[in-house]
Swiss-Prot record:
Cofactor(s), by name: heme b
Biological process terms in GO annotation: mitochondrial electron transport, ubiquinol to cytochrome c
Misc note: Heme 1 (or BL or b562) is low-potential and absorbs at about 562 nm, and heme 2 (or BH or b566) is high-potential and absorbs at about 566 nm.
Chain ranges passing through the membrane: 33-53, 77-98, 113-133, 178-198, 226-246, 288-308, 320-340, 347-367
Designated name of the protein: Cytochrome b
InterPro entries in alphabetical order: Cyt_b/b6_C, Cyt_b/b6_C_sf, Cyt_b/b6_N, Cytb/b6-like_sf, Cytochrome_b, Cytochrome_b_C_euk/bac, Cytochrome_b_N_euk/bac, Di-haem_cyt_TM
Gene3D superfamilies given in the database record: Cytochrome Bc1 Complex, Chain C
Entry binding sites for heme b b562: H83, H182
Length: 379
């Protein structure tokens, strides 16, 4: 009798995706982040669902409903901080996952990569809208500043902003619709992640060498299921440590003050995972230019496959490209630091130089270096 795992219509999909899937024998722990992102998404959906049971999306009661969750709901504080810090873990895994893709040339799987870029945008939109929901000072002013950026779009800008607000300022209508979108988007993300996996399994995984691994495949289970479980345990260890010891480490104290449209906080800044893009936005004096740079800072990922000039896929055997990759990482860390600093000397010029370097590295320096490496190998 044939195994039910291979014949049942539902089971065989799971089987071919997580059990009998032929996987390269040499993929390192950098390939763990896909499963970790899946775990993060599940944690966020579950904690978010329980938070939504007690949250009210009304400007008068939103802040106090979050306080009520933390004070009166059984383990409400735990659910709330798991959700808030779970978002940070989500983005750490996302950045490492994208970094892995850039380093090892995984972007050569075009459909998988482009859906990944779309997923990144969707997760960023979800996180932004989620940050507005507690209706603290930074929630309100963050929503005001970021939505206002759309007014830079010629001709339709101001109408578009008022349409998104549902009025003439960020108010009850804005909060209600942000809650609705924040609730639905994770399910769209889950569906997109399924499509992301579907396209990945059409080609099979890449591996650190960037060479074909068809000659040497091993089954996903038990080898990579065990390996992924180790990653999940480490993720849970870091997340619970963060939640139980310093839950507000990555948050902003201003968000513990209820939203007040008449009082602007001294430094309006987003959550830490948006700071690099925020620094790029602020480094351009022109409003429309800043908005374009902000969008391009993420959208540039979609153009990476077009900028691949090397004859090799991975950076494993390309020392010059490796150096540039780590300079890019350092540049992004610098931008993240600058995004959290006030707009004054010397931070302005550092931010502008780091922003220029970011685009120069990706668009010019790395492709030229790849051509140079081809010549060194007489290719």
């Amino acid at each position: 009798m044939t195994n039910i795992r291979k014949t049942h219509p539902l089971m065989k999909i799971i089987n071919s995706s997580f059990i009998d899937l032929p996987a390269p024998s040499n993929i390192s722990s950098w390939w763990n982040f896909g499963s970790l992102l899946g775990v993060c998404l599940i944690i966020q959906i579950l904690t978010g669902l329980f938070l939504a049971m007690h949250y009210t999306s009304d400007t008068m009661t939103a802040f106090s409903s979050v306080t009520h969750i933390c004070r009166d709901v059984n383990y409400g504080w735990l659910i709330r901080y798991l959700h808030a810090n779970g978002a940070s873990m989500f983005f750490i895994c996302l950045f490492l996952h994208v970094g892995r893709g850039l380093y090892y040339g995984s972007y050569m799987f075009l459909e998988t990569w482009n859906i990944g870029v779309l997923l990144l945008f969707a997760v960023m939109a979800t996180a932004f809208m989620g940050y507005v929901l507690p209706w603290g000072q930074m929630s309100f002013w963050g929503a005001t500043v970021i939505t206002n950026l759309l007014s830079a779009i010629p001709y339709i800008g101001s109408d578009l902003v008022q349409w998104i607000w549902g009025g003439f300022s960020v108010d009850k209508a804005t909060l209600t619709r942000f809650f609705a979108f924040h609730f639905i988007l994770p399910f769209i993300i889950a569906a997109l992640a399924g499509v992301h996996l579907l396209f990945l399994h059409e080609t099979g995984s890449n591996n650190p060498s960037g060479l074909s691994s068809d000659a040497d495949k091993i089954p996903f289970h038990p080898y990579y299921t065990i390996k992924d479980i180790l990653g999940v345990l480490l993720l849970i260890l870091v997340l619970t440590s963060l939640v139980l010891f310093s839950p507000d480490l990555l948050g902003d104290p201003d968000n513990y003050t209820p939203a007040n449209p008449l009082n602007t906080p001294p430094h309006i800044k987003p959550e830490w995972y948006f700071l690099f893009a925020y620094a790029i936005l602020r480094s351009i004096p022109n409003k429309l230019g800043g908005v374009l740079a902000l969008v391009l800072s993420i959208l540039i990922l979609a153009f990476i496959p077009l900028l691949h000039t090397s004859k090799q896929r991975s950076m494993m055997f390309r020392p010059f490209s490796q150096c540039l990759f780590w300079i890019l990482v350092a540049d992004l860390i610098t931008l993240t630091w600058i995004g959290g600093q006030p707009v004054e000397h010397p931070f302005i010029i550092i931010g502008q130089l780091a922003s220029i370097l970011y685009f120069l590295l990706i668009l010019v320096i790395m492709p030229i270096t790849s051509l140079f490496e081809n010549n060194l190998l007489k290719w």
